[in-house]
């Protein structure tokens, strides 16, 4: 194997290994695209690794991207999940959930998904 090929292989391996340590969302309730018949009491997020609670938050937005509230996430009995308790019931409409956490390597991880509440 040539030196260039070895360096390329090592670089590709490093990129793959770095990506393995990044946290990502596995599941959420309400889930992406879900239509609910009533307001949820909380937003619950599950990750592939334990989220860093001090760096985890959920921002709830209206469909037009106007902010409703940012909620500090709290730990749950499942170490891979966090909950964001809603301060009051949501009226019918379309919503966006912006979540943020950190991987154990310190990288900030973010995501957005939407859900609806039917009238």
Feature-to-residue mapping (PLM):
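Aromatic sugar-binding surface patches on proteins
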Residues: 77-84
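Extended, polar beta-sheet/loop recognition surfaces of beta-rich domains
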Residues: 36-38, 42-49, 106-119
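Proline/serine/threonine-rich low-complexity linkers at boundaries of modular beta-sandwich domains
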Residues: 16-27
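A glycine-anchored, Pro-Gly-centered beta-turn/N-cap motif
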Residues: 39, 86, 91-94, 100
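Short, exposed beta-strand-loop hairpins at the edges of beta-sheets
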Residues: 87, 98-112
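Short, surface-exposed alpha-helix to beta-strand junction/turn motifs within ectodomains of secreted
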Residues: 43-45, 49-68
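Solvent-exposed serine/threonine-rich low-complexity stretches and specific carbohydrate-binding patches
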Residues: 68-77
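Bacterial N-terminal signal peptides
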Residues: 8-18
């Amino acid at each position: 194997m040539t030196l260039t090929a070895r360096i390329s292989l090592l670089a590709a391996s490093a990129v793959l290994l770095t990506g393995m340590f990044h946290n990502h969302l596995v599941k959420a309730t309400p889930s992406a695209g879900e239509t609910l018949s009533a307001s949820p009491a909380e937003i619950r997020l599950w990750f592939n690794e334990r989220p860093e609670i001090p760096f985890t938050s959920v921002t709830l937005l209206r469909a037009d991207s106007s902010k409703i509230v940012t909620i500090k996430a709290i730990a749950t009995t499942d170490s891979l999940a966090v909950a964001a308790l809603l301060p009051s019931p949501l009226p019918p409409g379309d919503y966006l959930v912006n979540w943020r956490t950190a991987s154990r390597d310190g990288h900030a991880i973010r995501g957005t998904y939407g859900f609806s509440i039917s009238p």
